[in-house]
């Protein structure tokens, strides 16, 4: 298995020029390039205070998130969807598998469709590197991870980033685990809190040094992290998960690397043929002092909670 981190720097290092993009109107999304060979290798997206990047080498998934020009989630990690197949390994965004007997050849998530929208209009004129800005952004993509059909989207509007992963199993697949969505919070965050819709369940301080730790929160619905030095914090709220599948919060505290949050499902289970389920998160940010950060985080949680349709899990 190969992890493919920070590869956009290697591939795009020589591209120092920019080509203007165009936004279509009546033509519709069908005018966007069909072939991945014509898709952008890196897209920098700015909507209000939020900035993110869509990374081609990571199979057109997000790569880091900034808020008010401050790094909230690092680029040096995988986002999107990853599955761990029993006796095979990790496969998905930024996780590739070596093909047995074929040195140098890898198996990847097969992305078959990519559409970008700014201010609800399709973006045309794809170029290797693009800068997009507006009042709203949406990315829609379709892919296959072996027998799994995946439809995923990223939407930024009104100060909230919403990410969705819809999985459909065309055949049964034996899994160690699946991570439908994940976020690599900055290692600069020093404190955290987990909670449900009733309030905070757990709070703590991240490690400053030492070996990484990977706890699991099975009953929490959201995670908040905060960096007193910047006065900024991030929240991931689990809006939706299938009623017949778990939606746990697994997190890795890796000092100096990241504070990684993963939505975790199908742990040591077979995903049955015909499974059809949606996982969705809302990402929001806030400013606060060291004294009132939990209060500000809870207020932001309430705002993100309003995005939940339905309120608990997929019907």
Regions inferred by a protein language model and the residue ranges of each:
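Low-complexity, Gly/Pro
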Residues: 1-32, 313-315
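Beta-strand-rich recognition/accessory modules
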Residues: 32-50, 55-57, 224-315
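Solvent-exposed N-terminal domain segments of exported/luminal and surface proteins
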Residues: 35-120
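Short hydrophobic/aromatic-rich beta-strand segments that constitute the beta-sheet cores
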Residues: 54, 141, 150, 163-165
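Extended, loop-rich substrate-binding clefts of extracytoplasmic carbohydrate-active enzymes
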Residues: 91-158, 172-178
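Acidic (Asp/Glu-rich), glycine- and aromatic
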Residues: 157-199
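Extended amphipathic alpha-helical segments with heptad-repeat/coiled-coil character used for oligomerization
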Residues: 202-218
């Amino acid at each position: 298995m190969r992890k493919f981190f920070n590869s956009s720097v290697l591939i795009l290092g020589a591209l120092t020029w920019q080509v203007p993009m165009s936004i279509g109107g009546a033509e519709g999304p069908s005018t966007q390039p069909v072939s991945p060979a014509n898709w952008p290798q890196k897209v920098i997206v700015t909507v209000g205070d939020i900035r993110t990047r869509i990374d081609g080498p990571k199979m057109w998934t997000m790569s880091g998130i900034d808020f008010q020009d401050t790094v909230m989630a690092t680029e040096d990690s995988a986002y999107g969807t990853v599955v761990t197949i029993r006796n095979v390994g990790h496969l998905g965004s930024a996780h590739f598998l070596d093909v047995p007997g074929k040195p140098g050849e890898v198996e990847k998530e097969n992305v078959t469709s990519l559409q970008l929208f700014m201010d609800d209009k399709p973006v045309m004129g794809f170029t290797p590197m693009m800068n997009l800005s507006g009042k709203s952004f949406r990315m829609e993509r379709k892919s296959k991870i072996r027998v799994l059909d995946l439809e995923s989207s990223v939407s930024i509007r009104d100060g909230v980033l919403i990410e969705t992963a819809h999985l459909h199993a065309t055949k049964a697949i034996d899994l160690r685990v699946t991570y439908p969505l994940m976020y690599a919070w900055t290692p600069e965050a020093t404190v955290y809190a987990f909670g449900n819709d009733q309030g905070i369940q757990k709070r703590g301080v991240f490690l400053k040094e030492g070996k990484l730790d990977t706890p699991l929160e099975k009953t929490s619905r959201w995670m908040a992290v905060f960096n007193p030095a910047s006065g900024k914090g991030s929240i991931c709220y689990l809006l939706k998960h299938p009623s017949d599948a778990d939606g746990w919060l697994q997190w890795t505290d890796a000092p100096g690397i990241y504070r990684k949050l993963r939505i975790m499902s199908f742990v040591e289970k077979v995903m049955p043929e015909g499974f059809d389920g949606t996982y969705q998160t809302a990402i929001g940010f806030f400013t606060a002092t060291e004294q009132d950060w939990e209060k500000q985080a809870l207020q932001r949680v309430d705002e993100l909670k309003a995005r939940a349709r339905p309120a608990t899990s997929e019907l």
